[in-house]
């Protein structure tokens, strides 16, 4: 593996660990998800460029579209939660609370 692959894999792992460890605020969770999607986009782009498979050239763009949709939905949920509860805690999303 080259140094670039190792760095992208470490970026994905760091984002995943951040998502698992810092779950109190919704904004930090969204930032970690965006880091994971960016790492996946870079990995998919490198895979397509290295394989020279023309049919798979749309995969990174489709992944980028899904990342943009995920970011838009996450930010709209963040605005709705912060307007309703006044904070962006993830515990406010639990529907089983009394």
UniProtKB/Swiss-Prot annotation:
Q: How does it sit in the membrane?
A: Multi-pass membrane protein
Q: Where in the cell is it found?
A: Mitochondrion inner membrane
Q: Look up keyword Phosphoprotein and say if it applies.
A: no
The superkingdom of the source organism is: Eukaryota
- Write out the entry's keywords from A to Z: Electron transport, Membrane, Mitochondrion, Mitochondrion inner membrane, NAD, Respiratory chain, Translocase, Transmembrane, Transmembrane helix, Transport, Ubiquinone
Q: What is the predominant subcellular site recorded for this chain?
A: mitochondrion
GO-annotated biological processes: ATP synthesis coupled electron transport
- Span-the-membrane segments of this chain are 1-21, 29-49, 61-81
Molecular function GO terms recorded:
NADH dehydrogenase (ubiquinone) activity
Q: Which reaction does it catalyse?
A: a ubiquinone + NADH + 5 H(+)(in) = a ubiquinol + NAD(+) + 4 H(+)(out)
Q: Disulfide connectivity?
A: none
Assigned EC number: 7.1.1.2
Keyword Disulfide bond carried by entry? no
Q: Name one GO cellular component term.
A: mitochondrial inner membrane
Pfam families attached to this UniProt entry: Oxidored_q2 (PF00420)
Indicate the quaternary assembly.
Answer: Core subunit of respiratory chain NADH dehydrogenase (Complex I) which is composed of 45 different subunits.
Q: What does this protein do?
A: Core subunit of the mitochondrial membrane respiratory chain NADH dehydrogenase (Complex I) which catalyzes electron transfer from NADH through the respiratory chain, using ubiquinone as an electron acceptor. Part of the enzyme membrane arm which is embedded in the lipid bilayer and involved in proton translocation.
Family listed:
Belongs to the complex I subunit 4L family.
What's the protein name? NADH-ubiquinone oxidoreductase chain 4L
Q: Which gene encodes it?
A: MT-ND4L
């Amino acid at each position: 593996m080259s140094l670039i692959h190792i760095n992208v894999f470490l970026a994905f792992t760091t984002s995943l660990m951040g998502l698992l460890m810092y779950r109190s605020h919704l904004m930090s969770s969204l930032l970690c998800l965006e880091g994971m999607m960016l790492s996946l986009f870079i990995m998919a782009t490198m895979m397509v460029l290295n394989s020279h498979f023309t049919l798979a050239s749309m995969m990174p763009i489709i992944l980028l579209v899904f990342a943009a949709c995920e970011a838009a939905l996450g930010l709209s949920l963040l605005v709705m939660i912060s307007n309703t509860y006044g904070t962006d805690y993830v515990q406010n999303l639990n529907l089983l609370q009394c």
